[in-house]
């Protein structure tokens, strides 16, 4: 569908915890219906992911899920979302990603049945389609592995399916380094948008076929967040990064035009624009999150979020 009008009529309605189109998913969790829930991101410590270490990998995720759920119950959280961002090797071998998805789902189910903790599991396969140069986005082994990763993770119990897609990034990256706004606009507004339309038609179709899974959303992490980080390092002008940040909203909107319903990805800082246009719930992060991108914009980011998240934290004892 194309959006011809704003779903949110004014700033007084663009508030945290409420969306015109709430999303119900997982274990009795409704996002955007009056409460902001934590979304917890996590990852492995430095560890090779291979057959020889797979038992250790699984044990880390068992610990992560057990600890997060136990803390959520102890704090009497009204609900929680876990996000499992597959590492590249887990998308390369789709069965591995699905196995971890099943582990996390089992812990959430147990907490819901034992303590009534409402929850959902977001699963985000890695977009591995840019392995070749130029990348093969719609055919080839990488796409088949990515497609199978989505399918198996849905089957294993993923509630919200998302991705950080990379179509058009090879043109956009060069545009950033040369300060070429025409290349940036072409990468974001033409190449990325076309890839998003194609990709999200398929993600939404797989979610619909899988029953209870919902198509969450995409993020311009590989585009606008790259610009933001380079600007923080004084490698390109902050004004250019700000323009790219605003431009990225048009790209991420394409997912919602092709079946996404939210909640959007936390690292999609363009989320407030998406929420205002679509009315779908969004996940955000900012300076007051335990771990997040360096940014002075945390209060703005949290002003209209429906999930409050963090950048992935390694499973290490501090």
Predicted region positions:
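N-terminal small/glycine-rich loop or linker at the start of catalytic domains
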Residues: 3, 8-14, 19-56, 117-137, ...
